[in-house]
UniProtKB/Swiss-Prot annotation:
Keywords, ordered alphabetically: ATP-binding, Chaperone, Cytoplasm, Isomerase, Nucleotide-binding
Keyword Transcription: no
Gene3D superfamilies named in the record: GroEL, GroEL-like equatorial domain, TCP-1-like chaperonin intermediate domain
Chain sites annotated for binding ATP: T29, M30, G31, P32, K50, D86, G87, T88, T89, T90, G414, D492
Pfam families, sorted: Cpn60_TCP1 (PF00118)
Name this polypeptide is given: Chaperonin GroEL
Protein species of origin: Helicobacter acinonychis (strain Sheeba)
The protein's enzyme class: isomerase
Protein's cellular compartments: Cytoplasm
Record-stated family: Belongs to the chaperonin (HSP60) family.
GO molecular function, one term: unfolded protein binding
Function noted in UniProt: Together with its co-chaperonin GroES, plays an essential role in assisting protein folding. The GroEL-GroES system forms a nano-cage that allows encapsulation of the non-native substrate proteins and provides a physical environment optimized to promote and accelerate protein folding.
Length: 546
């Protein structure tokens, strides 16, 4: 297929047009008074959202060059959301403002490479000042404030997230699910839970709830398949003498072994339950080791030279309470040594930091949470499917932003943090580097101006008023007042501001230093010719039908 090439100003102007259209669609969602955007879906009802990245993801433009510009900035919004959970609209507004200011200067003859260098230096200096002005997230109240702001000022969601974080800690896993009704709920699973239920319903101890509960129990951990009773008979005899219940976690238990266990359970000879080991392959081995560390046991594995026939009671893990239903097993109050658990947690954190796979990272974080204290499930309720999706997106964003705040600290919100940081930056640059520096200094006012405009105020006036002051002074767009942002709880995670600025500068630099674009020429489909109508000449006599 033939390709078209566009050069210099012609290419950059079309790229800018794409960025402008994306920016205009996304900017309306910014701030506490941001508006909704209605998005047509290929099937089903349209979706309504106030989430910048959800709007950006839907945008495809007909002009191929303009679309390339839009797609690059869309990528920035997505990357910012992935890394920090929020700040997608901030990143888009900043990218547009930097590109707009930069394009004006480059069209006037500035050197794009020198301009880029100045922009990078300015961004780095502003980020350093942001870090200095940040403060650590203190208690539950500040976590509630961050979550509330990220959930578009929904205090209810903010409180749910703060409660969840308080229950499971900053390393705990918090998941978001759809509730059956219209009320929001929070469920917390204490201890370690994995998705394997009992191998036979005959292990149940509570017929009403269909659960098996074992108190002060031993836990046998093995990566072997148990099919013969003689494999575990010596160990069963030893545990029976102590009169304690036993949970067997193995690759599988089948045939004669499972039948014998069930029969002895029904006769009351053994207080026992059996489940399959969680996970698959290497992940299963690691999860068995996690359970062993948590319960103070040892995985009986032939790789380690251990066999079930020769296993001793000392190899068994111990737990205060174990609850098993048809789908899940929960181990509460594992009796492992705290320093062993801490070492294991540190090891998993190192693996999380070094892995490049999102899937592996997610699974490692789940393991970390199970060792660290538990899992919280926020169940989001809504009256309709459209509202449910929009609300669930907001909760996901708020959760990520809150984790970012706990991780790196918080700065004043409402777009004021960037302005405050820029006020403290004084770089002495020359030539076109200075031009790049000044571009960033002007562009960082854009988020505050846009928040004010969306709330019905003059953006320029608000920016000037905020610039006159120092410290934590900023603009509360909810009521139009100038306040101490920390005292009012108007705060943003440092990570969100940092990544939004870094990503915006990165994509703007790429666009400004673009000298040519290459795209496919759309071929117009030829309209098929009309068939010969000659045989219809006799229709002239139809005039009499009038």
């Amino acid at each position: 297929m033939a390709k078209e090439i566009k050069f210099s100003d012609s290419a950059r102007n079309l790229l800018f047009e794409g960025v402008r259209q994306l920016h205009d669609a996304v900017k309306v969602t910014m701030g506490p008074k941001g508006r909704n955007v209605l998005i047509q879906k290929s099937y089903g009802a349209p979706s309504i959202t106030k989430d910048g990245v959800s709007v950006a993801k839907e945008i495809e433009l007909s002009c191929p060059v303009a679309n390339m510009g839009a797609q690059l900035v869309k990528e920035v919004a997505s990357k910012t959301a992935d890394a920090a959970g929020d700040g997608t609209t901030t990143a888009t507004v900043l990218a547009y403002s930097i590109f707009k200011e930069g394009l004006r200067n480059i069209t006037a003859g500035a050197n794009p490479i020198e301009v880029k260098r100045g922009m990078d230096k300015a961004a780095e200096a502003i980020i350093n000042e942001l870090k200095k002005s940040s403060k650590k997230v203190g208690g539950k109240e500040e976590i509630t404030q961050v979550a509330t702001i990220s959930a578009n000022s929904d205090h209810n969601i903010g409180k749910l997230i703060a409660d969840a974080m308080e229950k499971v800690g900053k390393d705990g896993v918090i998941t978001v699910e759809e509730a059956k009704g219209i009320e929001d709920e929070l469920d917390v699973v204490e201890g370690m839970q994995f998705d394997r239920g009992y191998l036979s319903p005959y292990f149940v101890t509570n017929a009403e709830k269909m659960t098996a509960q074992l108190d002060n129990a031993y836990i046998l951990l093995t990566d072997k398949k148990i099919s013969s009773m003689k494999d575990i008979l010596p160990l069963l005899e030893k545990t029976m003498k102590e009169g304690k219940p036993l949970l067997i976690i193995a690759e599988d238990i089948e045939g004669e072994a499972l039948t014998t266990l069930v029969v002895n359970k029904l006769r009351g000879v053994l207080n026992i339950a059996a489940v399959k080991a969680p996970g698959f392959g290497d992940r299963r081995k690691e999860m068995l080791k996690d359970i062993a560390v948590l319960t103070g046991g040892q995985v009986i594995s032939e790789e380690l030279g251990l066999t079930l026939e020769n296993a001793e009671v000392e190899f068994l893990g111990k737990a205060g309470r174990i609850v098993i239903d048809k789908d899940n097993t929960t181990i509460v109050d594992g009796k492992g040594h705290s320093h062993d658990v801490k070492d294991r947690v540190a090891q998993i954190k190192t693996q999380i930091a070094s892995t490049t796979s999102d899937y592996d990272k997610e699974k490692l974080q789940e393991r970390l949470a199970k060792l660290s204290g538990g899992v919280a499930v926020i169940k989001v309720g809504a009256a309709s499917e459209v509202e449910m999706k929009e609300k669930k997106d907001r909760v996901d964003d708020a959760l990520s932003a809150t984790k970012a705040a706990v991780e790196e600290g918080i700065v004043i919100g409402g777009g004021a943090a960037l302005i405050r940081a820029a006020q403290k930056v004084h770089l002495h640059l020359n030539g076109d580097e200075k031009v790049g520096y000044e571009i960033i200094m002007r562009a960082i006012k854009a988020p505050l101006a846009q928040i004010a405009i969306n709330a019905g105020y003059d953006g320029g006036v608000v920016v000037n008023e905020v610039q006159k002051h120092e410290g934590h002074f900023g603009f509360n767009a909810s009521n139009g007042e100038y306040v101490d942002m920390f005292k009012e709880g108007i705060i943003d995670p440092l990570k969100v501001e940092r990544i939004a600025l870094q990503n915006a500068v990165s994509v703007s630099s790429l666009l400004l230093t673009t000298e040519a674009t290459v795209h496919e020429i759309k071929e117009e489909k030829a309209t098929p010719a009309m068939p010969d109508m000659g045989g219809m000449g006799g229709m002239g006599g139809m005039g009499g039908m009038m």
